[in-house]
Amino acid sequence: MKTTLKKPVAIVGYSGHAFVIIDILLSAGRLVTAYCDQEAKEFNPYHLEYLGKESDVINKLKKFDFFACVGHNGIREKIHTNLSQYLGNPINAIHPSAVISSSVKMGDGIMIAANATLNPLVEIGRGVICNTSTSIDHEC
């Protein structure tokens, strides 16, 4: 897949949930090149560069778009809040196979996985995870 001329992406958190996010971003043409986590991961299936803990590498992260790849809602929100004050808002990860009505309102830092459907007038807030084949009907 062709990549865009946008900044490369650094992910925050690098385990199971991150692998899904990376696949979505790659499918959408984004280049994912680095990650932040509490420590370097021995298992690095996407061969990403380890930048360090996100709180220690704010200046390094400025050359990237970022996405918080943490499944825990509270921790993900904390990462969004902390990093947004230095880096702007996180990007969205939307799989190309998702069906999204033009009237859907979306926050930032959301994940919409493969084959998800978001129907008219749906509102998705910041950091929401819509997993594989999620279906959200109208006006929800």
Region locations from a protein language model:
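Hydrophobic, well-ordered beta-alpha structural blocks that scaffold small-molecule cofactor pockets
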Residues: 1-45, 51-59
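Short, flexible hinge/linker loops that cap or flank conserved catalytic cores
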Residues: 2-3, 60, 104, 122
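A general structural motif
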Residues: 6-7, 32, 63, 87, ...
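Generic structural signal for conserved hydrophobic packing positions in ordered secondary structure
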Residues: 13, 66, 90, 137-138
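Short alpha-helical
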Residues: 16-17, 74-75, 105, 136
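Short amphipathic alpha-helical segments
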Residues: 22-25, 78-82, 124-125
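Phosphate-bearing ligand-interacting subdomains
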Residues: 40-100
